[in-house]
Amino acid sequence: MDPKTALLRALLLLLFLHLSPLGGRSHPLGGPGPASEASAIQELLDGLRDTVSELQEAQMALGPLQQGHSPAESWEAQEEPPARVLAPHDNVLRALRRLGSSKMMRDSRCFGRRLDRIGSLSGLGCNVLRRH
């Protein structure tokens, strides 16, 4: 075999072993066994049972307080959502319409809005009413 080819194959093998999930190593023998997994699952199950019993006790404590109400009544008692959900969007649309239909912009033939405002105060500009 050619030395270049052998070197290339060795480098590819090392790269493959480096990028493999286990890094070319096998599973350790002293890893978590079935007994430790079973005890962890048992602890989770015990915690779940405790949580369920606490929730049931809380529900029983609230039960007598809500005996006179049916589910439909409690649903109706909840606040209704606001009728207009897109209020900020509508405000933006109104502002854009005002900009497009501004009287000052329609009447002004010579200057922009700022110059019109200055012109109305100083007597300069196109749409200035002369007071003599």
Swiss-Prot record:
InterPro entries in the cross-refs: Natr_peptide, Natr_peptide_CS, Natriuretic_peptide, Natriuretic_peptide_brain
The keyword ATP-binding is assigned to this record: no
Signal peptide: 1-26
The record's account of how the chain is modified after translation: The precursor molecule is proteolytically cleaved, possibly by FURIN or CORIN, to produce the active peptide. May undergo further proteolytic cleavage by various proteases such as DPP4, MME and possibly FAP, to give rise to a variety of shorter peptides. May be cleaved at Ser-102 by the prolyl endopeptidase FAP (seprase) activity (in vitro). May be degraded by IDE. During IDE degradation, the resulting products initially increase the activation of NPR1 and can also stimulate NPR2 to produce cGMP before the fragments are completely degraded and inactivated by IDE (in vitro).
Disulfide links within the chain: C110-C126
Cellular component, GO, one term: extracellular space
Superkingdom, natural source: Eukaryota
GO molecular function: hormone activity; hormone receptor binding
Function, in words: Cardiac hormone that plays a key role in mediating cardio-renal homeostasis. May also function as a paracrine antifibrotic factor in the heart. Acts by specifically binding and stimulating NPR1 to produce cGMP, which in turn activates effector proteins that drive various biological responses. Involved in regulating the extracellular fluid volume and maintaining the fluid-electrolyte balance through natriuresis, diuresis, vasorelaxation, and inhibition of renin and aldosterone secretion. Binds the clearance receptor NPR3.
Family according to the record: Belongs to the natriuretic peptide family.
Protein name: Natriuretic peptides B
Organism of origin: Felis catus (Cat)
